[in-house]
Amino acid sequence: MTQKEKNETCIHVTVSGKVQGVFFRESVRKKAEELQLTGWVKNLSHGDVELVACGERDSIMILTEWLWEGPPQAAVSNVNWEEIVVEDYSDFRVR
C-alpha cells in the first residue's frame, strides 16, 4: 500500500435540515471538485441529502466541516457520516 493510498478514504454522509430546494447538491458538487474529491450526492425522499465522497483525508475533513454550513439558503440541523470502504469514482456527480 502506497502512502497516497493510506491517506485516502471514503465517507457516506446524510445531511438533515433545510437541505433540498436550496442548491445544496450543486454546492456540494462544486465544493467536492474544489477539494479534488470524487463520489456522488443525491436527494432522499424524506428531505435529507445523501452523499459519498472519496479522496485525501484532509480534504474529506474540510468537506465534513463545510457540510454544516452548506450554501447560504440551507439550514443544516445534522451531519451524520461514517468511513466506508474506498471506492473508485472518476468524478463527483449529482444523482
UniProtKB/Swiss-Prot annotation:
Example of a GO MF term:
acylphosphatase activity
Enzyme type, top EC level: hydrolase
Start and end residues of each Acylphosphatase-like domain = 10-95
Indicate whether Endoplasmic reticulum appears among the record's keywords: no
Tell me the organism. Coxiella burnetii (strain RSA 493 / Nine Mile phase I)
Q: Which family does it belong to?
A: Belongs to the acylphosphatase family.
Where are the catalytic residues?
R25, N43
User: What name has this protein been given in UniProt?
Assistant: Acylphosphatase
